[in-house]
Amino acid sequence: MSWLLGYVDPTEPSFVAAVLTIVFNPLFWNVVARWEQRTRKLSRAFGSPYLACYSLGSIILLLNILRSHCFTQAMMSQPKMEGLDSHTIYFLGLALLGWGLVFVLSSFYALGFTGTFLGDYFGILKESRVTTFPFSVLDNPMYWGSTANYLGWALMHASPTGLLLTVLVALVYVVALLFEEPFTAEIYRRKATRLHKRS
């Protein structure tokens, strides 16, 4: 990891912006979703849990676009690494980008908009937890697909800065999952218990 730091200026404004957006995004959506789950204030303000979820999801999408823009700007503002600047590495990056897109898009298809964007915090639950592809081959495929996208993008640009930021993306997702996974497991456990009692 230390060899990357020789190529990265952590004080460069676009790098700082990328770090801030990478850290802020999951923090924002987890704080807002937990607040909604406890208070239902967004659902009341919008008059519907669905409208509230769609609104939060739209904000998350815009924040993710901003994060990707800042990530790209940070890479472009810092030097490439000669050892990564080859056709082999470029096509490896392209393959990772493609793999990541498959997992992100198939996750979205399996979950739908509300399933992707924290609908369970709004009381919008599916019949049961999704276990079809890509969830049948990988836990949290949306997050790991997104991480693969950033890794692929960094390799395609031969960017040590991109690699370092990708590590940060992965770490932030791991921390987010420490909060999200227990909640999701518990909420579907409660639903299963309620259904069992009714039957």
Swiss-Prot record:
Residue intervals on the Lumenal side: 2-12, 34-45, 115-157
Domain of life: Eukaryota
Intramembrane stretches (start-end): 13-33
Gene: Pemt
Tissue-wise expression: Expressed in liver (at protein level).
Family membership noted in the UniProt record: Belongs to the class VI-like SAM-binding methyltransferase superfamily. PEMT/PEM2 methyltransferase family.
GO BP annotations listed: blastocyst hatching; glycerophospholipid metabolic process; methylation; negative regulation of cell population proliferation; phosphatidylcholine biosynthetic process; positive regulation of cold-induced thermogenesis; positive regulation of lipoprotein metabolic process; response to amino acid
GO cellular component, one term: sarcolemma
EC class name: transferase
Source organism: Rattus norvegicus
Pathway: Phospholipid metabolism; phosphatidylcholine biosynthesis
Name of this protein: Phosphatidylethanolamine N-methyltransferase
GO molecular function: phosphatidyl-N-methylethanolamine N-methyltransferase activity; phosphatidylethanolamine binding; phosphatidylethanolamine N-methyltransferase activity; S-adenosylmethionine-dependent methyltransferase activity
EC number: 2.1.1.17, 2.1.1.71
UniProt keyword Transferase present: yes
